[in-house]
């Protein structure tokens, strides 16, 4: 034992290393691994950051980073009030709000239902305003524009009555809301604004903005008080556009969108919206019975603060007779046309062309088609022909009032007496008014697919795009 200790005391360093080489190997392996990890940590950290950034951008696109802008747009139509809340990223792409791409709320009746009580008219928006503002982050509310665009229903009340209501709405926003109100935030939209906003909305959602005009789609929007037609035309047609009659808006609006200049034919036909057209058609028969009213019905139709007799003929409703009355109300008369091509009432039709080859038809066209049962109300778009409206009209005109709910279960009770009238008018508007062939395919649109979402195809989105783009 002593000899062994003596030998151990005289071992060289090399001998010791050789004798304990196994132990040293075991100790050195984790040390080397730790050193390698420390050496590689900066590179690994960068890689992790890049992966996280890529994944976040893949999940949310450009929407998940950078500033966001909100816009609150009220559509004060003749048939009701609606509010849209949109959120955009820095590239003007829509950002989801909760589980939808917009907040959309509506209620009835519209502002024009209170022509003699401006305060009550304005207060009808309170519920919509409170819910819309609550959806905007608190810190962004002072810079979030709010607009109230009144359409044809309010225009029909006359200047003074409509201005009194608008002033009451301005006072409501000022006293109740923290949202940003611009100088012209509350106004009656003119026809070119409403029509052009609708065109921008649908082409924005279809992602056709920035493409040649012939790749865009034309839009017909049938509201309650007016109907708008808008489509892009070539520059040479815009240069030769006739001057509108005094008091009418210009036929052509120049717009610069997504890096391309468009010449947009747009015209709004006041008093030709569906609810206004009912009044015009009832005016034709004056105080006598009307061939467009459902058999067995006798009542009064109210629109724009006026009452109109709405009573069926003793022989019942008649599609052919109703068509005659509708054509009369539309003023389809070529002698009024002083241009090469007209729609009705002597109005230039824009000349047609590539921007009109694909027509998207919105609002009441979709609603009545769904209620009449020839399109699925749960689908955002449907391809139909004007003939489909005529076929549905034939069924509605042969209906007695008491069998209305069984034949047309989706139609609201208040609309049943006028279903024959509505469908005949829509067919007449498309074929005799806008000159479409009865067999031409058109696209009825309620919502437009935008990524994984379906967005309401209404003019407020076009207004919101303009609002958030303004300095």
UniProtKB/Swiss-Prot annotation:
Its cofactor is Ca(2+). It is a single-pass type II membrane protein. The active site is at residue 194. It is found in: Golgi apparatus membrane; Membrane. It catalyses: a ribonucleoside 5'-triphosphate + 2 H2O = a ribonucleoside 5'-phosphate + 2 phosphate + 2 H(+). The chain crosses the membrane at residues 22-42. Disruption phenotype: No visible phenotype under normal growth conditions. Apy1 and apy2 double mutant displays developmental defects including the lack of functional root and shoot meristems, and morphogenetic and patterning abnormalities of the cotyledons. Double mutant exhibits a complete inhibition of pollen germination. It is an enzyme of class 3 (hydrolase). Expressed in roots, root hairs, root cap, leaves, stems, trichomes, phloem throughout the plant, guard cells, filaments of young stamens, stipules, papillae of stigmas, pollen, pollen tubes and the abscission zone of siliques. Residues 1-21 are cytoplasmic. InterPro entries: GDA1_CD39_NTPase. Residues 43-471 are lumenal. GO terms for biological process: pollen germination. Glycans are attached at residue 333. Keywords: ATP-binding, Calcium, Glycoprotein, Golgi apparatus, Hydrolase, Membrane, Nucleotide-binding, Signal-anchor, Transmembrane, Transmembrane helix. ATP binds at residues 72-82, 218-228. Gene3D superfamilies: 3.30.420.40, Exopolyphosphatase. Domain 2. Its EC number is 3.6.1.5. Pfam families: GDA1_CD39 (PF01150). Induction: By hypertonic stress. GO terms for molecular function: apyrase activity; ATP binding; GDP phosphatase activity; UDP phosphatase activity. Belongs to the GDA1/CD39 NTPase family. PANTHER family: ADENOSINE/GUANOSINE DIPHOSPHATASE, GUANOSINE-DIPHOSPHATASE. This is Apyrase 1. It comes from Arabidopsis thaliana (Mouse-ear cress).
């Amino acid at each position: 034992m002593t000899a062994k200790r003596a030998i151990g005391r005289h071992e060289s360093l090399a001998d010791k290393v050789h004798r304990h080489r196994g132990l040293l190997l075991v100790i050195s392996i984790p040390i080397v691994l730790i050193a390698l990890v420390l050496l590689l940590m900066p590179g690994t950290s960068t890689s992790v950051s890049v992966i996280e950034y890529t994944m976040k951008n893949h999940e949310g696109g450009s929407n998940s980073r950078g500033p966001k802008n909100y816009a609150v747009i009220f559509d004060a139509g003749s048939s009701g009030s609606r509010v849209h809340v949109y959120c955009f990223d820095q590239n003007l792409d829509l950002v989801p709000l909760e589980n939808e791409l917009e907040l959309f709320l509506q209620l009835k009746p519209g502002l024009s239902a209170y022509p003699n009580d401006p305060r009550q008219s304005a207060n009808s928006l309170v519920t919509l305003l409170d819910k819309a503002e609550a959806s905007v982050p608190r810190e962004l509310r002072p810079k979030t524009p709010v607009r109230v665009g009144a359409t044809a229903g309010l225009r029909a009340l006359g200047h003074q009555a409509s201005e009194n209501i608008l002033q009451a709405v301005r006072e409501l926003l000022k006293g109740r809301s923290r949202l940003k109100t611009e100088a012209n935030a509350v106004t009656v939209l003119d026809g070119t604004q409403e029509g052009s906003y609708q065109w921008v909305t649908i082409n924005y959602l279809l992602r056709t903005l920035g493409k040649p005009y012939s790749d865009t789609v034309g839009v017909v929007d049938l509201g309650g008080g007016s109907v708008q037609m808008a489509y892009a035309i070539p520059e040479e047609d815009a240069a030769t556009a006739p001057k509108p009659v005094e008091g009418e808006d210009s036929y052509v609006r120049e717009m610069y969108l997504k890096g391309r200049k468009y010449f947009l034919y747009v015209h709004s036909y006041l008093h030709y919206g569906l609810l206004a057209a009912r009044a015009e058609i009832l005016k034709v028969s004056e105080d006598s019975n009307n061939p467009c009213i459902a058999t067995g019905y006798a009542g009064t139709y109210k629109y724009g603060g006026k009452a109109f007799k709405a009573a069926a003929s003793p022989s019942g409703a008649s599609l052919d007779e109703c068509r005659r009355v509708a054509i009369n109300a539309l003023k389809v008369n070529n002698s009024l046309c002083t241009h090469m091509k007209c729609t009705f009432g002597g109005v230039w039709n824009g000349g047609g062309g590539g921007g009109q080859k694909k027509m998207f038809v919105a609002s009441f066209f979709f609603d009545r088609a769904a209620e009449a049962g020839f399109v699925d109300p749960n689908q955002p778009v449907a391809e139909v022909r004007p003939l489909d409206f005529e076929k549905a009209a034939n069924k509605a005109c042969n209906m007695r009032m008491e069998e209305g709910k069984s034949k047309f279960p989706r139609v609201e009770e208040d609309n049943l007496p006028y279903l024959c009238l509505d469908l005949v008018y829509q067919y007449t508007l498309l074929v005799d008014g806008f000159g479409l062939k009865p067999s031409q395919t058109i696209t009825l649109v309620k919502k437009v697919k935008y990524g994984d979402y379906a967005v309401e195809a209404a003019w407020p989105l076009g207004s919101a795009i303009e609002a958030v783009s303004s300095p």
